[in-house]
A protein has these predicted regions:
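Blade-level signature of beta-propeller repeat domains, shared across WD40, Kelch, NHL, RCC1
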Residues: 330-360
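Beta-rich, blade/repeat-based domains predominating
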Residues: 59-73, 109-123, 159-189, 219-240, ...
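Surface-exposed loop and turn segments in beta-propeller and other repeat-based domains
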Residues: 54-59, 105-109, 149-173, 211-222, ...
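Blade/loop signatures of beta-propeller domains
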Residues: 31-50
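Blade-loop segments of beta-propeller domains
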Residues: 88-121
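N-terminal secretory signal peptides and thylakoid transit peptides that target proteins
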Residues: 2-19
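Beta-strand-rich domains and repeat architectures in extracellular enzymes and scaffolds
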Residues: 51-85
Length: 360
């Protein structure tokens, strides 16, 4: 039987009943206000929330912000989906640590901008960018936007329909290629999640040659419903492992470094991606919260949680006047800054980037 991959709106709808069960438990308190500050979190993990942190020039507009990454200088890189019809509008924006706009580029990803990561190679930093919808590609770029290489569907994997590497239409099926995010390997290679297409995790070598794949569409335990985000977990005291967000199943799955299934961690509201800092793992959940786990994968804080509110107010993502300070709507990605602060990108119509500054 052919299994068809649901699109994002379908899984948000399908997940509503399950997500209603994921409420603001004791660990997920509502943000509190201290004088003019908005604080979220608890115990040793409290953060000052600054919504709409970057200062975007008036000539540009956010068009559904998707992912964020930080370079060694502390600059923030933001990718948004962009509108296909605005082909000259950039999809990637760069801001300095003081919130100021630095540059913009990446119009080639308009209408499909999705994943972005920064990686240092031989003393130089590069961007890795994944695009879905009709764009259907991934690229390595310099920090100023020059293309190093450009890739499309790995046909040698045997996963895709004939011609998928030249197909310019979005194919939301297990035979289609709609890449979402990256993770980096110690040998210079990388992993690419085909989260909205085949749900395979593809391994590439340091020269961007396809090596192998694992995963695919299925019901879990090594297969996925939406293999949306991933990370190589190298936190102290743990054996290195690959962690994949199986978003539509509401779980994280862990794998050995050669792609063998280990375990499933349940209890997430559409987990979208992963980052780590010291002993912490960060999991942005599309269902209105950001979760922090310790080195034992125990939940230590849930930040900006507004699960019940998002469940109750239909179409909240398009109603900015209804958003509450310190609460998230749809966190789609998050990453740590060098000092442990957190940037959050939300899948909302107007786009929104928040900075969480740690206060305890």
């Amino acid at each position: 039987m052919t299994t068809h991959q649901p699109n994002r709106r379908q899984f948000l709808s399908a997940a509503t009943a399950g997500a209603a069960m994921i409420t603001a438990a004791p660990m997920a308190f509502t943000a509190s206000r201290t004088s003019e500050e908005v604080i979220t979190g608890e115990g040793d993990y409290k953060y000052r929330v600054i919504h709409d942190w970057p200062m975007l020039p008036d000539k540009y507009t956010w068009q559904t912000t998707h992912n964020v990454a930080v370079d060694k200088a502390g600059n923030l890189y933001v990718i948004h989906e962009g509108r296909k019809e605005q082909a000259d509008h950039p999809s990637i924006f760069v801001f300095d640590p003081e919130r100021k706009f630095v540059r913009a580029f990446g119009s080639q990803f308009q209408g499909g901008g999705h994943g972005i990561e920064v990686r240092e190679e031989g003393g130089e930093e590069f961007l890795y960018v994944a695009a879905y919808q009709h764009v259907k590609c991934f690229e390595k770029m310099t920090l100023t936007g020059e293309t190093v290489w450009h890739k499309r569907a790995p046909m040698e994997s045997g996963v895709y329909s004939p011609g998928e590497d030249t197909n310019k239409t979005a194919t939301w099926t297990p035979k289609g290629f709609l890449p979402t995010n990256f993770a980096f390997l110690e040998d210079g290679g990388f992993l690419l999640a085909d989260g909205y297409g085949s749900c395979h995790i593809h391994r590439y070598d340091k020269d961007a040659n396809w090596v192998s794949s694992f995963g695919g569409v299925g019901e879990g335990k090594g297969t996925f419903k939406t293999a949306h985000g991933l990370w190589v977990d190298k936190r102290p005291g743990r054996e290195p492992s690959i962690v994949v967000t199986d978003r539509a199943h509401g779980t994280l799955q862990t794998f050995t470094m050669d792609g063998k299934y280990q375990e499933t961690l349940p209890g997430y509201g559409l987990p979208a991606n992963i980052d780590t800092y010291q002993n912490l793992m960060l999991v942005p959940e599309l269902k209105a919260r950001v979760t922090l786990l310790n080195e034992k994968n125990e939940v230590v804080a849930r930040l900006g949680a507004a699960v019940e509110r998002v469940n109750e107010i239909k179409g909240l993502r398009t109603q900015p006047d209804q958003w509450l300070p310190g609460q998230f709507v749809h966190p789609h990605d998050a990453c740590f800054a060098a000092n442990g602060d957190i940037y959050v990108a939300e899948w909302v119509g107007t786009g929104r980037i928040s900075r969480l500054e740690r206060v305890s």
